[in-house]
Each structure stands twice: as C-alpha cells, then as structure tokens.
Curated annotation (Swiss-Prot):
Protein source organism: Azoarcus sp. (strain BH72)
Any GO CC annotation of this UniProt entry: cytoplasm
Lineage: Bacteria, Pseudomonadati, Pseudomonadota, Betaproteobacteria, Rhodocyclales
Family classification: Belongs to the QueA family.
EC number: 2.4.99.17
Protein name (record): S-adenosylmethionine:tRNA ribosyltransferase-isomerase
Keyword annotations from UniProtKB, A to Z: Cytoplasm, Queuosine biosynthesis, S-adenosyl-L-methionine, Transferase
Catalytic activity reported: 7-aminomethyl-7-carbaguanosine(34) in tRNA + S-adenosyl-L-methionine = epoxyqueuosine(34) in tRNA + adenine + L-methionine + 2 H(+)
Subcellular location: Cytoplasm
Length: 345
C-alpha cells in the first residue's frame, strides 16, 4: 500500500486547538481506541484499562526556557530558540531576525549575556556562550518557555508548571512530551495501587518536532535527530514485564520513539544516542503494546506514527469521532489510549 502525505490530512476546526491547560491535569478527556471499538472516558479513568503487571514507560525530559530575546551589534532585534546545549558553553539554535547574523558576530541576549555566532549549518546557528556562563543556567535565568506555534499567546505563569510533566527531571527539550502532561500524583498513585509499574526513558524533544512534512512522497522525508537515553533499569523492567505476561505502555510518542529506536538493531539495550527514526505504516513495533498520546497535527509525522501503531483506518475513524465529539487537540488537549495492531496498514 503506497501512502502519500494527503492520506494523513484531516479537517480540524481551529476552535478545537487547546490554547490553555484545564484547571486539573487529569480532567482531560480520554478516547480509548481498541480496533473498531471507541470509548469516551476521562483521563482519571486510565487506571481502569491498565492491568496488574503492566509497565508504563514515561519520558522524564524537562522543557528548557529555550527562547531568548536580544539584539545584534547593529541594534537589530533577534529571537533565539536554543535547540540543544553542546557542553556547558555552546549551543545550536534557530535565530529569527530581519537579517541573519554572520559568523563572528556578537548577540547580546536579555541585555545581560553576550554570545558569539561561530557558524551556521542549515537552519541552526552554532553559538558560543561566555566561559563563566553555563548555557542551561542562562536559559533558566533569562529564557522563556517555548510554547508551540499553534498556541497563539505568550507563555504565562501557569505554563511554568503546566507545560512540564510532574516527573520532569532531565533538562533538554524545547517542547513538552505532552502525553505526560495529563498525569498527576493521584493518577500515578492509582496506577501503582493497581499493580502497574513505572519506568523512565529520556528523549529530548527538538524544535524539528514542529517542522511540517514538505514532500508528498513520504520516502523522501528526513526526520530531525533527537537525543535519547535508555537506562539499564528500564531495560530490565521491560524484560520482567514481558516474562510475566504484562504489557508495555509507552506514555507518549517520544517514549515510543526512544524505545523503538533502541530496539531496531536487536534486543532492547541500555545506552544513549541520537535517533531520526521515521515510523510509518508497515513499521514493525518491537517494544510497546499500548500507547498513551495526544491528538496530533494533520500531515504530521506523529499522526503517521499512531497510524502505524493502530492502523490508518482506525486512526482516521478515531479522529473523525474526536472532531465530531469536540475533543481538544494538540499539546494542551485531550488524550488517546491506543492498542497495537500488528496487522495495521
């Protein structure tokens, strides 16, 4: 079956794009999708679908205050979005300005820190921070949370808490692993009380997660690269779960991408690396049995991933139901619980 970009398009009324979080994390809705069966529930009901012995795998990345504002030496305004720190004093970043800064030029950020433009590769600039300034410290001191482009407002005080998961601990992302935003301590406690386990991976979400697919022939699309870490304890927890007949529940497409990337060359192994894995229908999943995820943008690689996991027609029907039922979409929107379909097309 040959798929094109148009196979992953759908009509979404703009008013269904959530612009702010709900008052409570777990107050969001949950669309449970198991083949042709759809069930409208609340996220607080998630533990009802988890069995004793199942294992949920979370992404513990923390969103950086990656957006900085400043000026060039010429006085022109610049907006800097740090994609990733490189060591303590360098970073890759996207820069928005009327004219791109030249290598060797200096930017003054937040009227406090002078950084040097070392060079450019594609859409990213290589920046050097002062020797007495750690990149992450500068971001936390002067930066702003980088809300997604479809949230049409500036980040506010509420986002400081709500655009981070309650278990975020490894700084490095420019976007939240949004499936994790629904979990609060009460839901986590109920999952543990049911006998479910929790394990952790880290995948630092890059700015490329918002880049559109620009080719109709999906084989020509190249994914952005993201850094991940799979701890040995997580590998062992997954092995125990499998041995005892439990299911592995990936919380979010970021957890899914980390797990499946680490299992492509053979059995799942602990370690760290980078992945540009592109998951399309026909992909053979090796780790996750279920997936907790939000609703994704039309024509996005994440919509392709969930279609690969549960089936293109299944996801198409589920999204049509979600639109008709006025679910809230994208980062601050509602959630889905999907079951893997090994015969998905």
């Amino acid at each position: 079956m040959t798929l094109s970009l148009q196979d992953f398009d759908y009509d979404l009324p703009p008013d269904l794009i959530a612009q702010a979080p709900l008052a409570e994390r777990s107050a969001s809705r949950l669309l449970v999708v198991d083949g042709d069966v759809l069930a409208d529930r609340r996220f607080v009901d998630l533990p009802d679908f988890i069995r004793p012995g199942d294992l949920l795998v979370f992404n513990d990345t923390r969103v950086l205050h990656a957006r900085l504002f400043g000026v060039k030496a010429t006085g022109g305004q610049v907006e800097v979005l740090v994609e990733r720190p490189i060591g303590a004093h360098e970073a890759l970043a996207q820069i928005r300005a009327s004219k791109s800064p030249k290598p060797g030029s200096t930017l003054r950020l937040a009227d406090a820190v002078d950084v040097t433009v070392l060079g450019r590769s594609g859409e990213f600039f290589h920046l050097r921070f002062p020797d007495d300034e750690n990149v992450v410290d500068v971001l936390e001191r002067y930066g702003k949370l980088p809300l997604p482009p479809y949230i049409q407002r500036a980040a506010g005080d509420a986002d400081e808490a709500r655009y981070q998961t309650v278990f975020a601990r490894a700084p490095g992302s420019v976007a939240a692993p949004t499936a994790g935003l629904h979990f609060d301590d009460a839901v986590l406690d109920r999952l543990r009380a049911r006998g479910a386990g929790c394990a952790w991976v880290t995948l630092h979400v890059g700015a490329g997660t918002f880049q559109p697919v620009r080719v109709d022939d999906l084989a020509q699309h190249r994914m952005h690269s993201e850094r991940y870490v799979i701890p040995q304890e997580t590998v062992e927890a997954i092995a125990r779960t499998r041995a005892n007949g439990g299911r592995v529940v990936a919380v979010g497409t970021t957890s899914m991408r980390a797990l499946e990337a680490a299992a492509q060359a053979g059995p799942l192994a602990a370690g760290s690396g980078e992945t540009d894995i592109f998951i399309l229908p026909g992909f053979r999943f090796r780790v996750a049995d279920m997936l907790v995820t939000n609703f994704h943008l039309p024509k996005s690689t994440l919509l392709m991933l969930v279609s690969a996991f549960s089936g293109t027609d299944v996801i198409r029907r589920a999204y049509a139901h979600a639109v008709a039922s006025r679910y809230r979409f994208f980062s601050y929107g509602d959630a889905m619980l999907l079951t893997r379909n090994d015969h998905a097309i």
